[in-house]
Regions:
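N-terminal intrinsically disordered/low-complexity leader segments
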Residues: 1-10
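Short acidic-hydrophobic sequence patches enriched in Asp/Glu that either
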Residues: 7, 54, 62, 66
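Helix-turn-helix
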Residues: 14, 22-61
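Short, basic, alpha-helical segments at the C-terminal edge of helix-turn-helix-like DNA-binding modules
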Residues: 63-71, 75-78
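Hydrophobic alpha-helical connector segments
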Residues: 74-103
Length: 103
């Protein structure tokens, strides 16, 4: 299989998109790992660390991206876990996210 080499900003976005997908699964935020994201993104396992550093920095970047994209399931899980970036989201967005937990 011939993998296409992406520009750094494109690769970083690909990793964030994959992370949001992984985090959006039931229980995904609490079980989120760099390896799971790398597998979803189809990239080397070390690339999430290369682009985002620590897991704390990675989670912050993921949640900020989820807030911008209004990924309600990810935001709801972040709120339930006490994530600071999720807590800083717009009140209306937080309310809509929490409604996804209610069913």
């Amino acid at each position: 299989m011939n993998k296409k080499r992406l520009l750094p900003n494109d690769r970083k976005q690909q990793i964030l998109d994959a992370a949001i997908k992984v985090a959006g699964r039931p229980g995904g935020w609490s079980k989120l790992t760099r390896d799971a994201v790398a597998k979803e993104a189809g990239c080397a396992e070390g690339l999430p660390s290369k682009y985002f550093g620590t897991m704390i920095s990675f989670r912050r970047a993921i949640m900020r991206a989820a807030v911008v994209a209004e990924e309600l399931g990810v935001i709801a899980q972040g709120l339930a876990a006490g994530d600071k970036s999720a807590q800083k989201a717009d009140p209306d967005l937080k309310a809509r996210a929490l409604n996804t937990l209610a069913g």
